[in-house]
């Protein structure tokens, strides 16, 4: 088990359409001390969850492309709720819409330690 990192205040929603990536990420983040509130693979399901559970999570790792649907409206919703968003994407920064280029992101294939480091910078002691 990985050493506990200062992400214990992170109540995290993972929104990723690739099952293996989502589950691997969830396990690594749990080991780092994050509280995973959900792992969701579909944009419409994630949008409903965000609407119905606002305030129950404070961070989301969001894949930009979920089964061919771009997640920008969901990212806007999460941001308006005060949720810290980290993008997980196979796109380079130049492929992102301009409004989203400054958000923290990990490009696929991603490095788990880098992603955990991003969360630590948001929720660290």
What annotation goes with each model-predicted range?
Residues 61-79:
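Conserved phosphotransfer microenvironments
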Residues 1-13, 110-125:
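Non-catalytic signal-transmission and effector/linker regions of two-component phosphorelay proteins
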Residues 72-73, 80-81, 91-108, 113, ...:
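Alpha4 helix (beta4-alpha4-beta5 surface) of REC/receiver domains from two-component response regulators
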Residues 16:
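Conserved acidic carboxylate
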Residues 49-52, 77, 118:
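CheY-like receiver
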Residues 19-38:
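Two-component/phosphorelay signaling modules centered on CheY-like receiver
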Residues 39-59:
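Acidic, metal-coordinating helix/loop segments flanking the phosphotransfer/catalytic sites
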């Amino acid at each position: 088990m990985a050493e506990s990192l200062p992400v214990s205040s992170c109540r995290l929603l993972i929104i990723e359409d690739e099952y293996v990536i989502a589950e691997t990420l969830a396990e690594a983040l749990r080991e780092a001390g994050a509280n995973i509130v959900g792992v969701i693979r579909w944009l419409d399901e994630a949008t409903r969850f965000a609407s119905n559970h606002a305030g129950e999570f404070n961070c989301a790792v969001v894949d930009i492309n979920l089964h061919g649907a771009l997640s920008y409206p969901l990212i806007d919703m999460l941001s308006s709720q005060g949720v810290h968003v980290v993008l997980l994407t196979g796109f380079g920064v130049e492929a992102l819409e301009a409004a989203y280029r400054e958000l923290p992101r990990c490009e696929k294939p991603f490095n788990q330690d880098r992603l955990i480091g991003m969360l630590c910078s948001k929720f660290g002691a």
